[in-house]
Amino acid sequence: MQMGLDFNLVEELVAGVDEVGRGPLCGAVVTAAVILDPRRPILGLNDSKKLTEAKRDALFDEIREKALSFCIARAEVEEIDRLNILQATMLAMQRAVEGLHITPKLALIDGNRCPKLAVPAAPVVKGDSQVPAIAAASILAKVTRDREMSEFELIYPGYGIGGHKGYPTPVHLEALARLGPTPIHRRSFAPVRAAWEAREGHSNTLI
C-alpha cells in the first residue's frame, strides 16, 4: 500500500534524503539522497521499516537502476563520537546531497531538521511514508547499513550484531557488559561508555 505517498513530487528534480542508524550503539550512520525519474516509476516504494527484507533488497536494486541520481553517504563512529549523533547525521546527509551528480531543485529531508545545503531544502516529518524519493532514500540507506551489520557479525561474534543491527536490545546490552565495546561501538553513547568504564575499572583493580 502506498496511500500516503504523493507522486506529484516526482515531477520535479526533487531529492529525497533519509538516514538510518541514529539509535544504534555501534556502526556508522548511513544516509542516502535520491532523485527519482518520473518516466521510470518504481512500484512498491514505502518507508523501509514497513517492508520485508526481501522487498527492500529488490527495491534497492531497482532504485539504483532507475533513479536519475542517487548517493549513499555516511558518518563514521569517530565522527559520531566527536561531533554528537545529530551533527554527524546532518554531515552525512550533506554528503549524500553533495554526492548527487545532478543538482536537485529542492531537497526534502525526512524529519524535522535540515542540514546546511547549497540547494533549497525543507524538512518533512514522516517523509518516508509521504514522499516517494524519501522512501527510496530510506531503502538505500537501510539496506546498505543492514548489510554492513551482517558483515560485522562475522568480525565481532558474540554480540548478535547481525540480528539487532546495533540497536540497544537486551541481547546487545548483555554482550556489551560481558565482552566490552568493540572498535565499532560509539563510546559517546551512555551504555557503551558505561561498559567501557566498567572494564577500565576492572583492569585497574587487577593492576
Curated annotation (Swiss-Prot):
CDD domains referenced in this protein's UniProt entry, alphabetically: RNase_HII_bacteria_HII_like
Keyword Nuclease: yes
InterPro entries: RNase_HII, RNase_HII/HIII, RNase_HII/HIII_dom, RNaseH-like_sf, RNaseH_sf
Matching SUPFAM superfamilies: Ribonuclease H-like
Keywords, ordered alphabetically: Cytoplasm, Endonuclease, Hydrolase, Manganese, Metal-binding, Nuclease
Biological processes per GO annotation: DNA replication, removal of RNA primer; mismatch repair
Identification of the protein by name: Ribonuclease HII
Organism: Pseudomonas entomophila (strain L48)
Encoding gene per record: rnhB
